[in-house]
Amino acid sequence: MPQEQTLERPGVAVEASAHAEHRITFAPAGVTLACAPGQSVLETALGAGYFPKHSCRRGECHACCTPIKSGSVSYPEGFVPEGVPEGYCLTCMARPQGQVEIEAPEVSSVPGRRVVRAGARVLSTERVSHDVTVVQLQVPRNAGFDFSAGQYCDVLLRDGNRRSYSMANAPDGSGVIEWHVRALPKGRFSPHVYKALKPGDMLRVEGPFGGFALSTSDKPVILLASGTGYAPIAALLKTHAEVLKARGAALYWGCRRLEDLYAFEEARAWGAGGDHLRFIPVLSEHGRNWSGRSGFVHEAVAQDFPDMSGMEVYACGNPLMVDAARATFTREHALPNEAFFSDAFITVMSHPRAAP
């Protein structure tokens, strides 16, 4: 087991004991779980069927940044939780030391859907842009692969690696899942999707994972996506369209060029329902004929909403965009930290989100 890191800061253990009994309580549900030595808060929760908010599982995206109500945590040697406010922890990396209680309103008092591993048959592939393929898969209905809008699953590769993709469709119990796969030249999986994957092929998948989900609040919503970060946002829209209209929602989708908005007509249809659900495309590289918004997508949001104190933001896609949006909105536009929900797509290393 790696040696624990000594960190002199509130809410972080100064010294770890391998023999102590480690327990984590999720408030306000009151769920208490025993943690094995060296196991993270998130690993413990997922293993028991609970889904705290999370995304990358590597300490990079900060989607799992959670307030510590009492107790302390430690981190693996060499890991520094940069940018984490005092009194908070990254549950994907944090290890409870003794008794720890964290604030996680998304955790219910009853375990949620279990993680399963199953074969999945390719139903269809559709090239929707120069580098994005929409893949539909059929998981056996009796496999118990029950997901919620906003979650993702892993495809298990023959070399032992895995790649993660968000479901872009609404869950309906049919076992059908849809991915939006962007091809990267040096990727382990996406080039195969782009060049060779065909209907009838079999893949091995594991999931569902992720705590990215629409809250039960009645606050207005900003849906923020870059690139294929549109996929989990589309799942939220398809599942909760009426709720989002009732709350008031604005969908901002940023891409480089117009042709990169691979589901433009679908997104525009969402925004055709009047002021209660608007669609604002934003291009960073546009031609002369583009009359819409330009620049960075999170900056377009900031221009339109100087005060976000009474709103919620759901951001998906490039981690640089997600991080910039979080920093800008919380520091300069009064968005509460707990009102920023994210699913950052990390493209390399052990647990990538929407990886190549």
Region spans (language model):
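Ferredoxin-reductase
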Residues: R114-M202, P220, C255-R257, V282-H286
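Histidine-anchored nucleotide/phosphate-binding helix
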Residues: A234-E242
